[in-house]
């Protein structure tokens, strides 16, 4: 029977000092012996996805205390990728994931907490907390802040839905008037919550459902809706039950590594492909799997991508649907239900509620459930009122979207595409693979060949795109922006958005060893591995080289002879200490970022730290 970790600091005469300090936090004699549960919050006023979380930790803590536990709350950092986008701030985004994971480990292990409730929401916060949870392997439940309502505005006598990406594109489009750009900007992000499309934050919060570490509704129920409060109340109660099951009944099924098993990771990736999630999810799932010591690699993702259809299409791949529409159609469980009926899921998995996949679907799939309360929860909709307050409205759709032929979520027979929303490509400058969000690629450019325009920084590429130096048919290559080369593997949302602004969204490709925002669509290929800074062949591409992209056949090829590539590699190596670095780039890199770069691996490894360099 495992002993409560917290007993290390609460029992024994030699821990009198520790108990004295615990008493100073409000604990009493009656609390020593109860499980100490960390409420890992991420409230910050910098991020709309987190601005409403200030009081939600207290909400969870009250339920923990009522159920017989002791709750202790702390906060992690949280970077807003949208605000950090397009300048040096983006260098810090991905490295913040490792800082978050480490800070959770530091706090939980330093104070010997027994379990956690992770209150996350945005891009790197959920992955960082997920990595920490699987590293620590103590009972955990995730409950996110929830999605933002979609923006809405009237243009040309028509009400249209908007999000952050629309504001970016229109702001850079010279054909759009100042007044229209201002109107879109003011309407794009109307409420608290994670940005309203199937961007990275919402993708990851959906995947925690598929991994079994969060409750049904976590990924899609709006931040503003009163129904979301119940997820926080339930999490506080349930974590005490899971904690006691493990420590008092020796039930290891309550541990995250047993819930988020290899089968669960495969289900999560299957969901990701079917819903056309952000390419960043590949990076984060690979990283989380390593923390869980699960053999889950790019090869597994490639195999799944070849057999899983696209059953859901959401912004940025279409402006018709946002997360509020996914929820109305049944949310994550609705998509999992269709995948299960198609025979594409591992059924022998459980979630934090203790339910198997079939039991979860029977209870929560809107196509199966007889529970009116569940159906009512999935009718929770937007209010259209600007707010930064959680649970501030209780509007409902008149009906569910259960149209699996023409609705937001489709059945296998009516799939948007027989190929899923993500694909892994391989070729002579992406030997370890690269990722494309096929959900956002127009059918006309699934095969594309063009001359390379090579840039050694995102800034130079943006200047060229906006300056008219990139023309239809070009393949824009942005290198030395990987985890090590950037450092920090910047997101390329501005270059891809500006290609659209210049009318080139369906006429050009963009390839990078960096990554993309979940808001990116178009022929945008990222995570090229190995990255240029690690000696990857993307560092050998020259202006004018032809690059052939073949998504249906999962290929990407630099049309240069092996002999020529060998000669270029020899010339690169001859640069000595300057080999595999940008030739003409001045970038101030802080010590903190240099420390990150010194251990960073390429994207095919999840951009995690290279343990071999630390003797691990």
From Swiss-Prot:
Binding positions ([2Fe-2S] cluster): 122, 195
Positions that bind Mg(2+): 81, 123-124, 491
Cofactor(s) required for function per UniProt: [2Fe-2S] cluster; Mg(2+)
Protein keywords: 2Fe-2S, Amino-acid biosynthesis, Branched-chain amino acid biosynthesis, Iron, Iron-sulfur, Lyase, Magnesium, Metal-binding
Cellular component annotations (GO), alphabetically ordered: cytosol
Enzyme Commission code: 4.2.1.9
Cross-referenced Gene3D superfamilies: IlvD/EDD C-terminal domain-like (3.50.30.80)
GO MF, any single term: magnesium ion binding
Identification of the protein by name: Dihydroxy-acid dehydratase
HAMAP family: IlvD (MF_00012)
Catalytic residues in the record: 517 (proton acceptor)
Record text on cofactor binding: Binds 1 [2Fe-2S] cluster per subunit. This cluster acts as a Lewis acid cofactor.
Record note on quaternary structure: Homodimer.
Family indicated by similarity: Belongs to the IlvD/Edd family.
């Amino acid at each position: 029977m495992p002993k409560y970790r917290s007993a290390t600091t609460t029992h024994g005469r030699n821990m009198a000092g520790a108990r004295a300090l615990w008493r100073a936090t409000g604990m009493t004699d009656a609390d020593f012996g109860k499980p100490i549960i960390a409420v890992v919050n991420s409230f910050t006023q910098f991020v709309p996805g987190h601005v409403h979380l200030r009081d939600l930790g207290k909400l969870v803590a009250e339920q923990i205390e009522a159920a017989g536990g002791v709750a202790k709350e702390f906060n992690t950092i949280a970077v807003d990728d949208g605000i950090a986008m397009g300048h040096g701030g983006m260098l810090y985004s991905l490295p913040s994931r490792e800082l978050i994971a480490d800070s959770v480990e530091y706090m939980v292990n330093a104070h010997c907490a027994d379990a956690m409730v992770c209150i996350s929401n945005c891009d790197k916060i959920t992955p960082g907390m997920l990595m920490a949870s699987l590293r620590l392997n103590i009972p955990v439940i995730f409950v996110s802040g929830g999605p933002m309502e979609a923006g809405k505005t009237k243009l040309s006598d028509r009400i249209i839905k908007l999000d952050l990406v629309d504001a970016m594109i229109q702001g850079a489009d010279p054909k759009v008037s100042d007044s229209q750009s201002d109107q879109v900007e003011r309407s794009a992000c109307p409420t608290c919550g994670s940005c309203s499309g199937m961007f990275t934050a919402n993708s990851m919060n959906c995947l925690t459902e598929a991994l079994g570490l969060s409750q049904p509704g976590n990924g899609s129920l709006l931040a503003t809706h009163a129904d979301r409060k119940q997820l926080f109340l339930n999490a506080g109660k349930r974590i005490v039950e899971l904690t006691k099951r493990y420590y008092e009944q020796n039930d290891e099924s309550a541990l995250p590594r047993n819930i988020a098993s290899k089968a669960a990771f495969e289900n999560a990736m299957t969901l990701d492909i079917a819903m056309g999630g952000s390419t960043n999810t590949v990076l984060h799932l690979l990283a989380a799997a390593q923390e869980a010591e699960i053999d889950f690699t790019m090869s597994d993702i490639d195999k799944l991508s070849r057999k899983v259809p696209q059953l859901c299409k959401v912004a940025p791949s279409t402006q018709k649907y946002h997360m509020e529409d996914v929820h109305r159609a049944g949310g994550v469980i609705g998509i999992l239900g269709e995948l299960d009926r198609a025979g594409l899921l591992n059924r022998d998995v459980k979630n934090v509620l203790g339910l198997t996949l079939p039991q979860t679907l029977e209870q929560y799939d809107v196509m199966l459930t007889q529970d009116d309360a569940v159906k009512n929860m999935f009718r929770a909709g937007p209010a259209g009122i600007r707010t930064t307050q959680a649970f501030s409205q209780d509007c409902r759709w008149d009906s569910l979207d259960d149209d699996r032929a023409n609705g937001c979520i489709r059945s296998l027979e009516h799939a948007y595409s027989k190929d899923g929303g993500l694909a892994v490509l391989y070729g002579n400058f992406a030997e370890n693979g690269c990722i494309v969000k096929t959900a956002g690629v127009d059918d006309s450019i699934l095969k594309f060949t063009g001359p390379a325009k090579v840039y050694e920084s995102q800034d130079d590429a943006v200047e060229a795109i906006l300056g008219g130096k990139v023309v239809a048919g070009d393949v824009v290559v942005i290198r030395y922006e990987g985890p090590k080369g950037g450092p920090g593997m910047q997101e390329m949302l501005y270059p891809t958005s500006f290609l659209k602004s210049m009318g080139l969204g369906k006429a050009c490709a963009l390839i990078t060893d960096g990554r993309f925002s979940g808001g990116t669509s178009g022929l945008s290929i990222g995570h090229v591995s190995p990255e240029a800074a690690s000696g990857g062949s993307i560092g050998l591409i020259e202006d004018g080289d032809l690059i052939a992209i073949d998504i249906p056949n999962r290929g990407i090829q630099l049309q240069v002879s092996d002999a020529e590539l060998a000669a270029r590699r020899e010339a690169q190596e001859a640069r000595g200490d300057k080999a595999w670095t940008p030739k003409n780039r001045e970038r101030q890199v802080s010590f903190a970022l240099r420390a990150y770069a010194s251990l960073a691996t390429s994207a095919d490894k999840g951009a995690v730290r290279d343990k071999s360099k630390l003797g691990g």
